């Protein structure tokens, strides 16, 4: 059994902390929350400290933040219905653009692999795709109204311009740009959860997706592409996503976030029961019928709901979490 070792407990925000995001280099992270502020933290020696506080970009709670793949830009999604884009061009972080269009709370934001596209989603049930048109210029490329309820999360595929979204309507949807007319289309709907899908994450290759839900389960989905050797039909030459594994019984409340480590293959969850759990694929797992086991769990990782978990993209086995209890914690998975 592995163990989850607590390395750091950090405080600074007032009220609940909604989101944390590692910088691509792994030596900096950002956090956001109820206090309408973003904090940028960096590591010097063995100490994490706040280097910058960005407090003038939003009028309401900041729900999520994400670094661009190049690490130069930070996007923040807020309950004030806007998404702000920050960069450090002059040595200090500044808000360079504010993206408006959603009717109410923006719940999630995600950069595409190239950094050329940005996706946002909202309680208004829509997903917006923005093109980065140049210096601090963002143009709306698509407004996607495929979901019937609040959209909780958007995540880009790790290698392709395919977007996944998760919703209060219990489904996950995939979107891609049509080869014919450059319109964005919904190419797949993933239905198996019986309640809100809170979060999703792709594996390193992007052929599998993990989802977590209010129904207290984790699900693993696999993409079957046209011409696949499993004999799965692919109508309209679109990839089909099938649920190939369901993990239940480990969580006692809603699972709010999930992160699939691109370095180790481990899956981490943040739960409404205050716990963090780590899952790994078993050694005898099959491609079309994968099996996962719980490697370790920290049942009282936080004193209240765990809102976000994210694996460090550059340091294998390092995990960050944040909570309604107003703390950020950094963990290390040890053998």
UniProtKB/Swiss-Prot annotation:
Gene3D superfamilies: YVTN repeat-like/Quinoprotein amine dehydrogenase. Pfam families: WD40 (PF00400). SUPFAM superfamilies: WD40 repeat-like (SSF50978). WD repeats lie at residues 12-51, 57-96, 101-140, 146-185, 192-231, 250-289, 301-335. It comes from the Eukaryota. Keywords: Repeat, WD repeat. GO terms for cellular component: cytosolic [4Fe-4S] assembly targeting complex; metallochaperone complex. The keyword Nucleotide-binding does not apply. InterPro entries: CIAO1/Cia1, G-protein_beta_WD-40_rep, WD40/YVTN_repeat-like_dom_sf, WD40_repeat_CS, WD40_repeat_dom_sf, WD40_rpt. GO terms for biological process: iron-sulfur cluster assembly; protein maturation. Essential component of the cytosolic iron-sulfur (Fe/S) protein assembly machinery. Required for the maturation of extramitochondrial Fe/S proteins. Belongs to the WD repeat CIA1 family. This is Probable cytosolic iron-sulfur protein assembly protein Ciao1.
């Amino acid at each position: 059994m592995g163990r989850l070792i607590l390395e750091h407990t950090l405080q600074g925000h007032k009220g609940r902390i909604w989101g944390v995001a590692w910088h691509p280099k792994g030596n900096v992270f950002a956090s956001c929350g109820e206090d309408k502020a973003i904090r940028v933290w960096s590591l010097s020696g063995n100490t994490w400290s706040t280097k910058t506080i960005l407090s003038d970009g939003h009028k309401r709670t900041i729900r999520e933040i994400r670094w661009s793949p190049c690490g130069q830009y930070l996007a923040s999604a807020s309950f004030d219905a806007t998404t702000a884009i920050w960069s450090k061009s002059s040595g200090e972080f500044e808000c360079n653009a504010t993206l408006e269009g959603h009717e109410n709370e923006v719940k999630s934001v995600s950069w595409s692999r190239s950094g050329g596209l940005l996706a946002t989603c909202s309680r208004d049930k829509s997903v917006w795709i923005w093109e980065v048109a140049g210096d601090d210029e963002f143009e709306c490329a698509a407004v996607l109204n495929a979901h019937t309820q609040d959209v909780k999360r958007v995540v880009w595929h790790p290698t392709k311009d395919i977007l996944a979204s998760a919703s209060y309507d219990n489904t996950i949807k995939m979107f891609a740009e049509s080869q014919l007319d450059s319109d964005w289309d919904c190419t797949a709907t993933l239905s198996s959860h019986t309640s809100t899908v809170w979060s999703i994450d792709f594996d390193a290759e992007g052929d599998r997706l993990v989802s977590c839900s209010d129904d207290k389960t984790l699900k693993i989905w696999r993409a079957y592409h046209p011409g696949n050797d499993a004999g799965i039909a692919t109508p309209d030459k679109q990839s089909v996503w099938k649920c190939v594994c369901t993990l239940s019984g480990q969580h006692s409340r809603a699972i709010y976030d999930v992160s699939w480590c691109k370095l180790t293959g481990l899956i981490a969850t943040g739960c409404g029961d205050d716990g963090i759990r780590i899952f790994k694929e078993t050694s005898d797992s099959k491609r079309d019928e994968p099996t996962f086991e719980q490697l370790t769990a920290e049942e009282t990782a936080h004193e209240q709901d765990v809102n976000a978990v994210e694996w460090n993209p550059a340091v294998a086995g390092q995990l960050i979490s944040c909570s309604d209890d107003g703390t950020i914690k950094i963990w290390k998975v040890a053998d």
